[in-house]
A protein has these predicted regions:
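N-terminal Rossmann-like NAD(P) cofactor-binding subdomain of oxidoreductases
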Residues: 1-171
């Protein structure tokens, strides 16, 4: 078997105690090109846990699986030091007024919203490669887009005729 020359990506997962974070730990721990250097909760950021801020120069990417509002705090301090992939809703909306409307609170890092790249890698690979702040789409847009894009691209359905009615038993 031929060995790959690809370098492993050094990753940190913040918020690994929640559903999204624990699933990400499970997935990335089996990935051949990812080495999880640290994972934990927001305590890592406050200094109550093992602090990673001093070691960011050794990290390639930080996955933020934190409650809404917490990734903003991390990004304010670290967006120039490391690539951040936010799995919360903190950087999905470009307009701070929309964030206030949907989340009921002001965005604390609104100056970073224009820098954030939102999108699926299947559709926005080049933009995501260049970005240091990536807003991962949520479960609804991901499931819908992955299902309908091949149908639209193949000319099998007209995008003007699509109606999505999504429900969740867990949120």
């Amino acid at each position: 078997m031929r060995k790959s020359k690809l370098k492993k990506i050094n990753a940190v997962i913040l918020g690994s105690g929640g559903y999204t974070g624990s699933e990400l730990v499970n997935i990335l721990s089996k990935h051949p090109y990812v080495k999880i250097q640290n994972f934990g909760s927001e305590r890592v950021l406050t200094g109550k846990g093992k602090n990673i801020n001093d070691k960011l120069s050794l990290i390639d990417v930080v996955f933020c699986c934190l409650p809404d509002g917490e990734a903003q705090k991390f990004a304010i301090k670290n967006h120039k030091k490391v690539t951040i992939i936010d799995l919360s809703g903190d950087f999905r909306l470009k307009n701070p007024a929309s964030y206030l409307q949907y989340y009921g609170k002001d965005h604390k890092a609104s100056n970073l919203l224009p820098e954030a790249t939102y999108g699926l890698t299947e559709l926005c690979k080049n933009e995501i490669k260049k970005s240091k702040l990536i807003a991962n789409p949520g479960c609804y847009p991901t499931s819908i887009l992955l299902a309908i894009i091949p149908l639209i691209s193949g000319g099998l359905i007209n995008p003007r005729n699509i109606i999505i009615d999504a429900k969740s038993g867990f949120s």
